[in-house]
């Protein structure tokens, strides 16, 4: 896992993100990357800032970027393994392929970025991540609470988190405040959902 604070130096760009309704619109999107098409919106511009010249991760060959946003507050509550979560424990995967063929194919790399200052007022909403808990451990016996201790990362304004999104992770229950984040997964092959 890589965590970098104050990653984006252009704070005016982050202010634009905070107030841009299109940036925060729900749903999953795909971006082929700056080498295949010019960025056409703020999300794609952010992806380029994170992964082009400024990439904190060694170069990887990628087919592109799946991206989406989440806005959570205290009303978002899911229960899993007798605990309450804003975003329940899960593995990022090619969702359509998993539903159609029961195959788990995970992204190369996962990214979470917190572009809004209000995140610093948040209570709860921690990212829990188990580096040694891939989906194969849960397939036969169902999901169970891991013996290993998770990494627990506090959301923070302008914090970039790079991690293995194919391993178990989730977001703890929010006590107060609002948690807005963008998630970006790098894939070596475009997920089947985007092939239609």
Predicted regions: what they are:
Residues 1-160, 166-196:
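Fe(II)/2-oxoglutarate oxygenase catalytic core
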């Amino acid at each position: 896992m890589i965590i970098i604070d104050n990653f984006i130096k252009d704070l005016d760009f982050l202010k634009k993100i905070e107030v841009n309704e299109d940036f925060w619109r729900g749903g999953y999107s795909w971006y082929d990357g700056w080498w295949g098409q010019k960025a056409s919106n703020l999300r794609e511009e952010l992806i380029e800032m994170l992964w082009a010249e400024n990439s904190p991760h060694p170069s990887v060959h990628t087919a592109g970027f799946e991206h989406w946003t989440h806005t959570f507050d205290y009303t978002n509550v899911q229960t899993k393994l007798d605990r309450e979560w804003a975003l329940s424990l899960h593995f990022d995967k090619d969702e359509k392929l998993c539903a159609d063929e029961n195959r788990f194919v995970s992204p190369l790399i996962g990214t979470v970025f917190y572009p809004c200052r209000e995140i610093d007022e948040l209570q709860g909403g921690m990212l829990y991540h188990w580096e040694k808990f891939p989906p194969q451990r849960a397939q036969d016996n169902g999901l169970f609470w891991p013996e290993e201790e998770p990494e627990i990362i506090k959301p923070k304004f302008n914090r970039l988190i790079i991690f293995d999104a194919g391993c178990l992770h989730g977001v703890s229950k929010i006590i107060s405040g609002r948690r807005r984040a963008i998630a970006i997964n790098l894939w070596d092959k475009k997920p089947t959902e985007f092939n239609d």
